[in-house]
Amino acid sequence: LNRVVSELLELVKPTHLALQAVDLNTLINHSLQLVSQDANSREIQLRFTANDTLPEIQADPDRLTQVLLNLYLNAIQAIGQHGVISVTASESGAGVKISVTDSGKGIAADQLDAIFTPYFTTKAEGTGLGLAVVHNIVEQHGGTIQVASQEGKGSTFTLWLPVNITRKDPQG
């Protein structure tokens, strides 16, 4: 219940971003470590190869970690047992692109347009708030997020974040 209330509050009253220079290689490695025990217990491989040419970006590291954790935990649930979650990061124009790909059950084509809508869920136990919060945080950072999925094959969530943020948060 506390998680639901916290997520709901983040949707209606976004928090102020605590911006700082962020090394994405370090942040991604750290966020993967946070879910590694859960993934290992389900025999899910976590794959990430650091990209030495990746620029630092201006971001809120806690909020960005929250985004990645939500994507990883959704991927772990979608896979269930025995699968792979791959994370890639690369330069893309004046920003960076981060992709999280899983070998899970995928998302039905008719559900893709609603995936970031508050209260929409594909899971019996889900609140439908997690991806809405993810979308909100990415937008606060001046970025975008997209999903590509094929039922039975898995999903890829792709974030694009600018190197230098144009503030979009309420206190900005």
Residues covered by each model-derived region:
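Conserved catalytic submotifs in the C-terminal HATPase_c
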Residues: Q20, N40, Q45-P55
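Short helix N-cap motif at coil->helix boundaries in the Bergerat
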Residues: L24, G106-A114
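A conserved beta-strand-to-alpha-helix junction within the catalytic ATP-binding
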Residues: A18-L32
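Short alpha-helical Gxxx[C/S/T] motif in the catalytic ATP-binding
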Residues: G130, V134
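Conserved micro-motifs of the catalytic ATP-binding
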Residues: T15-L17, E56-A59, T122
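Short beta-strand/loop element within the Bergerat-fold HATPase_c
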Residues: H82-A94
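Detector for a conserved hydrophobic position within an alpha-helical segment of the HATPase_c
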Residues: I137-E139
